[in-house]
């Protein structure tokens, strides 16, 4: 089949790769001049299938109220006049219950674990390189109450068969030796040994080259205007370079997905949650991380990417903004200086990206009420973690193949 994919982030490119492997003729369209130049460009770098946890969780409303008055809060709420923002926030609040948390986390772990397996298989098949490491993730707790409160997460990990270790201070230092100088800054940690790290931008560009070798065509610098309909199905994509037609269409536009499909009567409650990162060259190996360390207090991930440290995180609900506030940079600097002062922060680059978040933190993967229109979007902070699994899953669904994992609860129908 001829299939057009809208979006060349890590989700769009992995989808293109898996569709091409199944023999389809694939074209990818994007407004940027190359792959992964928006949200996939400088994310935190961790592939954490065992760590996914919904932002909508019991206790989050109270925590969010407290964070409003903190200088280095992990969540920043900047209200706008957009009613979409208020509706999304109300939907998120509705998911802050014990029952919804368990359902949503189980969905997330299912997709993420499958995606990690797909990534490993892809790596074996292609030999792709992207500064990858397979040395686990350490969630670091600065306060005892944080360590004492991981019972629900451990319950879900056990239920889903995800290996984990609860570590004391010495155990944390054993897996991340550079923490020896900061033992007074934390009380313990939760380690997920099967997690990985890697540069999402490098991966996406390398996979795009591989996909081109399989026949995928990329059309960059092309603005997507609208989806055209005829006879109850999608008949084409109106772009700045004319109308593009295909047999099947995939929308993988992250936070911009809702605007494109709204005219079709489809509701995708995906809202941009802004994240920040800095990337610094390593100047002191003894004070740099081995893999990824998650600073629970600031919701920040500190990741080793080759000879660089990537520090990323926070969640800012402020709409489609691209500013780089000094206060956000200060929070990133504070966390990494506290724990891993081995990077040259004076030489660091500062970046922000709009992470496409659903109210239940679960991505939208699957078909729509239009037989030839599919969606792969809304992965929030876990686009890199879930990319390969999401791409392969959707490729199987489009091709009519039996999916490797349950997919019926991942589609847009749960909102419409």
Swiss-Prot record:
The protein's required cofactor(s) are namely: FAD
Q: Which reaction does it catalyse?
A: a D-alpha-amino acid + A + H2O = a 2-oxocarboxylate + AH2 + NH4(+)
Q: Is Manganese one of the keywords? A: no
By its UniProt entry, which InterPro entries does this protein fall under?
DadA, FAD-dep_OxRdtase, FAD/NAD-bd_sf
SUPFAM superfamilies, sorted: FAD-linked reductases, C-terminal domain, FAD/NAD(P)-binding domain
Matching Pfam families, A to Z?
Answer: DAO
**Annotated keywords:** FAD, Flavoprotein, Oxidoreductase
Protein's name in the database = D-amino acid dehydrogenase
- Show the coiled coil region(s): none
User: Among its keywords, does the record have Flavoprotein?
Assistant: yes
From the UniProt record, which GO molecular function terms apply? D-amino-acid dehydrogenase activity
| PANTHER family xrefs | D-AMINO ACID DEHYDROGENASE, SARCOSINE DEHYDROGENASE-RELATED
Q: In which pathway does it act?
A: Amino-acid degradation; D-alanine degradation; NH(3) and pyruvate from D-alanine: step 1/1
Question: What NCBIfam families would the database entry show?
Answer: PRK00711.1
């Amino acid at each position: 089949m001829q299939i057009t994919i809208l979006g060349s982030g890590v989700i769009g490119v992995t989808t293109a790769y898996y569709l091409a492997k199944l023999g389809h003729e694939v074209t990818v369209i994007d407004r940027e001049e190359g792959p992964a130049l928006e949200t996939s460009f400088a994310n935190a770098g961790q592939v954490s299938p065992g760590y996914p946890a919904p932002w909508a969780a019991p206790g989050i409303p109270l925590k969010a109220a407290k964070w409003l008055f903190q200088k280095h809060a992990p969540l920043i709420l900047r209200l706008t006049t957009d009613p979409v923002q208020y509706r999304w926030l109300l939907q998120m609040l509705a998911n802050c219950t014990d029952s919804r948390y368990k359902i949503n986390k189980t969905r997330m772990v299912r997709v993420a674990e499958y995606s990690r397996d797909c990534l490993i298989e892809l790596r074996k098949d292609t030999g792709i390189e992207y500064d990858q490491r397979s040395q686990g993730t350490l969630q670091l707790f600065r306060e005892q109450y944080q360590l004492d409160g991981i019972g629900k997460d451990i319950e879900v990990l056990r239920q889903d068969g995800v290996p984990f270790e609860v570590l004391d201070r010495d155990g944390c230092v054993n897996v991340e030796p550079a923490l020896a100088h900061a033992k007074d800054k934390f009380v313990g940690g939760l380690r997920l040994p099967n997690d990985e790290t890697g540069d999402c931008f490098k991966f996406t560009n390398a996979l795009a080259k591989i996909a081109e070798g399989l026949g995928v065509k990329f059309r960059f610098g092309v603005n997507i205007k609208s989806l055209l309909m005829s006879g109850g199905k999608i008949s084409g994509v109106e772009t700045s370079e004319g109308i593009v037609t295909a047999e099947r269409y995939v929308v993988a536009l992250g936070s911009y997905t809702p605007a494109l499909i709204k005219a079709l009567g489809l509701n995708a409650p995906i809202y941009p949650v802004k994240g920040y990162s800095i990337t610094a060259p390593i100047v002191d190996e003894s004070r740099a991380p081995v893999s990824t360390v998650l600073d629970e207090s600031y919701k920040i991930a500190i990741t080793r990417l080759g000879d660089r440290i990537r520090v990323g995180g926070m969640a800012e609900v402020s709409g489609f903004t691209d500013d780089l506030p000094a206060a956000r940079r200060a929070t990133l600097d504070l966390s990494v200086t506290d724990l891993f002062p081995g990077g040259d922060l004076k030489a660091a680059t500062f970046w922000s990206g709009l992470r496409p978040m659903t109210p239940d933190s679960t991505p939208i993967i699957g078909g729509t009420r239009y037989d030839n229109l599919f969606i792969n979007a809304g992965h929030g902070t876990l686009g890199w973690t879930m990319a390969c699994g999401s791409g392969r899953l959707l490729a199987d669904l489009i091709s009519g193949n039996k999916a490797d994992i349950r997919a019926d609860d991942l589609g847009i129908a749960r909102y419409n």
